[in-house]
A protein has these predicted regions:
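Absolute protein N-terminus
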Residues: 1-2, 102
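Short, well-ordered beta-strand segments in beta-rich or mixed alpha/beta enzyme
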Residues: 2-9, 39-75
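Short amphipathic alpha-helical segments
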Residues: 14-40, 79-83
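Short conserved AdoMet
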Residues: 30, 66, 92
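Glycine-rich beta-strand-turn "strand-cap" elements at beta-sheet edges
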Residues: 39-57, 82-102
């Protein structure tokens, strides 16, 4: 299994716009062969100093894939290219962390 933690930083005030485009793309991604989990998450509230918040312009995509082949196919899927084109002017940065369980 391959896990992905993608940290997406939207341009100021654009997170909800990016999330709307992301959510529209979720059904196509979840239908991909090898997709086990794919969804967004934002800072939880109510944890005080226990939590290091990412901020109002950031969301994280939590993904699980059966194997590297499935993730590589996802990266070049046409719906991902369309999502990238729709959101390119709204995203300030992204950091993709690809992880293997130990």
């Amino acid at each position: 299994m391959i896990r992905v933690v993608a940290v997406i930083t939207a341009k100021p005030g654009r997170r909800e716009d990016v999330l709307a485009a992301f959510r529209a793309n979720v059904p196509a991604v979840r239908a991909e062969a090898g997709c086990l989990e794919y969804g967004p998450a934002v800072d939880a509230e109510g944890f005080g100093s226990f939590q290091a918040k990412m901020g109002p312009d950031v969301f994280v995509v939590l993904e699980s894939w059966e194997n590297a082949q499935a993730l590589k196919a996802h990266a070049v899927a046409p719906h991902m290219a369309a999502y990238a084109a729709r959101t390119k002017d709204m995203i300030a940065s992204r950091a993709i962390h690809i992880l293997s369980p130990v």
